[in-house]
Amino acid sequence: MIKKMKFDIFYVDAFSKEVFSGNPAAVIFKHFEDEKMQSIASENNLSETAFIDLENNYIRWFSPKCEVDLCGHATLAAAHVFFEYIDNNSSLITFNSNSGELKAYKKDSIIYLDFPKDNFKQVDE
């Protein structure tokens, strides 16, 4: 017996206005168990698939092989989908993530990302 699943997947070409150019990412506004998210990302076979749980705006990114801590182009893609299809009256979304709060602003059809500052450490040579 085949088990069916139904959900929307948005394919976005980040950093481009042209289809089939830029940096592709898949975006899914639905929460799944970790194993299911990994399977979906593997099936998509893109560098990253972003999963966003709209109950708490929690975003996670999966490559075909594993979960990753942060992905800029997939976050940009998720913000684009949010502003265009989820809440087109909004100009700000704050994603919660394992890397902290990630803010996306939309102004004049341009999306800006504000990521947390990384704390660099000096390493010995």
Residue ranges and their predicted role:
Residues 16, 53-54, 106-108:
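Short, low-complexity Ser/Thr-rich regulatory SLiMs
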Residues 29-33, 55, 84-87, 109:
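Short loop segments at secondary-structure junctions
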Residues 39-68:
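Anion-binding (especially nucleotide phosphate/pyrophosphate-binding) glycine-rich loop
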Residues 33-38, 122-125:
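Short, conserved charged micro-motifs
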Residues 15, 40-43, 95:
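Short Gly/Pro-enriched turn/cap motifs at secondary-structure boundaries
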Residues 25-28, 50-52, 102-105:
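Short beta-strand scaffold segments in enzyme catalytic cores
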Residues 62-125:
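Acidic, low-complexity central loop/insert segments
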Residues 2-36:
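Polybasic, low-complexity association/targeting segments
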